[in-house]
C-alpha cells in the first residue's frame, strides 16, 4: 500500500495527517516523520514512502535532492512536496499551486469570507460556508492551476478577459513578505500575468524574488518597495497576499480611503494561528468597501493540500470532508 508523510521540525501541531485522512477516508496512511535531522528524514522517505510533504526548515534542502523539478520549483528554488516516480524524485511546490488556485477562484468572485449579522468576519477559524462555496467551484480549476506557466504573452489566466476579473486593468498584487510561502505566492501571481509589488523587511530578499520573476518573462513587472510604503501600496493593490507573522505598524491605521470603494479588493493571509487582520479591521474594511473580501490562512492550507494530495495519489480528495477538519 502507498504511504505518505510529512517531514519538518517541529510538526507535531500539523493538520496535514487529519486533512489527508479526511480527503481519502483513511484509504492511505499518512504519517509525521518527526526529526530535526533532514538527512534522516529524507532517508526514511526513500525507504518507505511514495511521497512526502515538506515544511520548514527543510524546503530548500529537499529541493536540492530532487532529480526532476516542476516549473514552479525551478523558479522558487524550494519544494514542499516530493514524489517518487520511475524517473526519480520529482519536486513540486503546492504553496504555489494553492495560491494560484485561490487567485483563479477570486477571479470568478469566489473565496470570500462572509460576515456575521454584525458585519464581523470570524477569522479565528475558516468559515465553513466560505470554504464550501469555493469548494463547489474549485475542482474545475485544479487542472488549470497545475498547467505550465504562460510565457507567450502577458494575459489574464485561463483565457479570461480583463473584464472577467472585475477590473478595468491587469490586477496589481501586493505580496507582503517574500520568504518561502511569499515567494511561491509572488510566482503564482506572476504566472497569471499580474503586475506585482513586493515588500519584505530585508529588501534584498524582495529584489532577488523580483529578479526571478523577470526571468520568467521580461514583460512581467515586479516593483520592489520598502515596508514603510505599505499603506500606499495597499491602497494601490487589487489583491494583497500577506505572508509575515506579525502586523506591520501601518496595518491598524488603514482608513476607508485605503480600502477603496467601488472596486473589488481581495486579501489572502497565510497565518491562520494568529492572524494580523483581526475582526475589527475586517469589519472596518467591509463597512468601507462591501466589495472587499478577506480569506484566512486555513483556506490557503486547504487549497495547497487539495492540489498537493492529488499529485500524490492521482485522485481528487473529498473537499467536503477536508473542510470539516479545518
What positions do the PLM features span?
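Rossmann-fold NAD(P)-binding glycine/threonine-rich loop
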Residues: 267-319
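NAD(P)-binding Rossmann-fold cofactor-contacting core
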Residues: 194-216
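Glycine-rich adenosine-cofactor-binding loop
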Residues: 8, 91-96, 103, 170-190, ...
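Short acidic low-complexity segments
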Residues: 39-41, 217-236
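Rossmann-like NAD(P)-binding element
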Residues: 230-253
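Short glycine-/small-residue-rich Rossmann-like dinucleotide-binding loops
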Residues: 57, 243-246, 271-272
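Rossmann-fold NAD(P) dinucleotide-binding segment
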Residues: 61, 247-268
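Phosphate/diphosphate ligand-binding glycine-rich loop within oxidoreductases
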Residues: 2-108, 284
